[in-house]
Amino acid sequence: MYRFVTSNRHKFEEVSEMAALYGIEIEWVRMKYEEIQDDSTERISYDSCNKLSRIVEAPYFVDDSGLFINALRGFPGPYSNYVSSTIGNEGILKIMDDVDDRTAYFLTVVSMNEGHSITQFIGKVMGKIARSIRGSNGFGYDPIFIPEGSDRTFAEMDIKAKNAISHRSIAFRGLFEYIKMNQTAKK
């Protein structure tokens, strides 16, 4: 049984649906944990995974995600959670009000501790910031992020459509394919 350590119910639901497609059952370890403040999403995810080894039985995984807005030099980036909880989507839109370059990307880094090592999986999706909040599905920045090739925000998509293209789904597909490959190799 693989454990997903997160306090975010929405994340767990998204990831559970993806895991089921691979025939992988995951357990939710609902837990808040302290993250280091760092400019690297990869380091934040790795450090969290490493620290949790003292209290969570392997195998388990964590993820860290960020929204990186090009015109704002990557802000909010690895500080996305804090920015979301303080100024929210309205604040981001206000900062972006007179900005023409609305290109951005979402990045997710999944770190899995197998007991002997930590392996990372990265997912990235390019897109742009909408001019208004749109949609009611998803969470976080979903109502203001329009993925490349779409005219809808993530929040305007159902979970299946979002999971087909999102940064989180790319990273977690990498994880689940890795798990399946290792399960096959052990047989």
Curated annotation (Swiss-Prot):
Highest taxon in the source lineage: Archaea
Group of enzyme by EC: hydrolase
Family (UniProt): Belongs to the HAM1 NTPase family.
The name this protein goes by in its record: dITP/XTP pyrophosphatase
CDD domains (UniProt xref): HAM1 (cd00515)
BP GO annotations: nucleotide metabolic process; purine nucleoside triphosphate catabolic process
Molecular-function GO terms, alphabetical: dITP diphosphatase activity; ITP diphosphatase activity; metal ion binding; nucleotide binding; ribonucleoside triphosphate phosphatase activity; XTP diphosphatase activity
Catalysed reactions, semicolon-separated: XTP + H2O = XMP + diphosphate + H(+); dITP + H2O = dIMP + diphosphate + H(+); ITP + H2O = IMP + diphosphate + H(+)
Required co-factors: Mg(2+)
Species the sequence originates in: Thermoplasma acidophilum (strain ATCC 25905 / DSM 1728 / JCM 9062 / NBRC 15155 / AMRC-C165)
NCBIfam families: PRK14821.1, RdgB/HAM1 family non-canonical purine NTP pyrophosphatase
Keyword Transit peptide: no
Biological classification of the source: Archaea, Methanobacteriati, Thermoplasmatota, Thermoplasmata, Thermoplasmatales
Cofactor: binding comment: Binds 1 Mg(2+) ion per subunit.
Segments traversing the membrane: none
Keywords tagged on the record: Hydrolase, Magnesium, Metal-binding, Nucleotide metabolism, Nucleotide-binding
Family matches, as InterPro entries: dITP/XTP_pyrophosphatase (IPR020922), ITPase-like_fam (IPR029001), RdgB/HAM1 (IPR002637)
The keyword Magnesium is annotated on this UniProt entry: yes
Entry's Gene Ontology cellular component terms: cytoplasm
Function field: Pyrophosphatase that catalyzes the hydrolysis of nucleoside triphosphates to their monophosphate derivatives, with a high preference for the non-canonical purine nucleotides XTP (xanthosine triphosphate), dITP (deoxyinosine triphosphate) and ITP. Seems to function as a house-cleaning enzyme that removes non-canonical purine nucleotides from the nucleotide pool, thus preventing their incorporation into DNA/RNA and avoiding chromosomal lesions.
